[in-house]
């Protein structure tokens, strides 16, 4: 799975974040309290620490305010699921 602009991601630990881009190329994952380079994830969107594995990717084009993604009560039910881990 290759990440792209306007996507919301959900980690195994439940945190949601957004894909940040530079010159239309995704390069960082941004969360409420940290950022991480996309290069830390393999092709299956797994991290060295399983708690930070990406388990779901959503189309974030419907998100009106990107800061809402960082709220604990952010609801992904209204977003279109693009990819889900099989584990």
Locate predicted features:
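Exposed beta-strand and adjacent loop surfaces of beta-rich binding modules
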Residues: 6, 26, 54
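Short aromatic-centered micro-motifs
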Residues: 9-10, 20, 57
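SH3/SH3-like beta-barrel fold
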Residues: 28-32
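Intrinsically disordered, low-complexity, charged/polar segments
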Residues: 34-87
């Amino acid at each position: 799975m290759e990440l792209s602009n306007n996507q919301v991601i959900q980690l195994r630990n439940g945190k949601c974040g957004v894909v940040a881009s530079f010159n239309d190329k995704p390069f960082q994952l941004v969360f409420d309290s940290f950022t991480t380079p996309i290069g830390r994830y393999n092709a299956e969107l797994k991290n060295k620490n399983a708690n930070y594995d990406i388990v779901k990717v959503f189309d974030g084009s419907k998100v009106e305010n990107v800061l809402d993604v960082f709220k604990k009560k952010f609801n992904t039910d209204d977003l279109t699921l693009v990819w889900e881990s099989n584990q």
